[in-house]
Amino acid sequence: MPELERMLDLLSEDELRAVIKESSKDDVVVSIIEGFVRRKLEFTPDDIRTETAILLSNADDYIFLEKSMFDSSLEELFPENKALALLAETVFNGFYDRAEMMVSMGMLNEARLFIRSVAEAIRHFIGDESITLIKLCGESASRFADELESFLNSDDPLGGFHKK
């Protein structure tokens, strides 16, 4: 949909959020999300297919949990902050796998930039306050939030992040 991509370039982040909230057509919404994330992170749609929900979510207003890789809506299974934490961890681990592959190929700097851009995108869209809220959602979620913060403040090649 080239016309949709042209429209994306003209919209601000707030305008994109408004379009997404008002749209009831999943294919259009998914295209908008993919276009937005592709522009912001310079990834291809295949890199982010089902994981894009977290990047346009926050603790108060998360979107399309049913678009995640889980069969049932996380909204029905968890309080919103637990769902957010689980989605964030799933997304981050998926990108971390790719970064580990880059490291194994000797692409250390590329891996570090790749994973940091994802971590910063997560922080940008859910906010520092939401990272704090994630810590209240149980031991695993708290560990994830601590490690995300540690990664963002680290100068180590991969930030010392440990997959769970």
Language-model segments: residues:
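Eukaryote-biased, non-catalytic alpha-solenoid scaffold regions
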Residues: 1-7, 14, 18-21, 25-164
